[in-house]
């Protein structure tokens, strides 16, 4: 849910989510290329969980959902995705619980 309540616009948290999804996808693509897997399609979204406490708002969670199709074994894609989850620079900078859901098609 955006802070703009139906009006056009994007808030900083949505931009962080978009950056996280893009960074993860790029990291996953790079890791797979290192494994010799180059014919893939990666689509990733990130859902940011924003909580309010006495000190203000805090990003508590980031949930990545990625769908990968291509010429690799699902186990190779899964392993690369787990590595990308913790290895992408945006994941490293977030002080939040990061979860990942991978679908291989």
Name each model feature, range by range.
Residues 1-18, 22-105:
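Extended beta-strand/beta-hairpin segments
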């Amino acid at each position: 849910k955006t802070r703009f309540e139906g009006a056009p616009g994007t808030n900083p948290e949505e931009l962080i989510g978009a950056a996280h999804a893009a960074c993860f996808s790029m990291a996953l693509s790079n890791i797979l290329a290192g494994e010799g897997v180059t014919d893939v399609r990666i689509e990733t979204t990130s859902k940011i969980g924003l909580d309010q406490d006495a000190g203000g708002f805090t990003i508590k969670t980031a949930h990545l959902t990625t769908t990968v199709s291509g010429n690799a074994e699902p186990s190779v894609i899964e392993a690369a995705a787990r590595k990308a989850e913790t290895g992408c620079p945006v994941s490293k900078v977030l002080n939040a619980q990061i979860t990942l859901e991978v679908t291989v098609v």
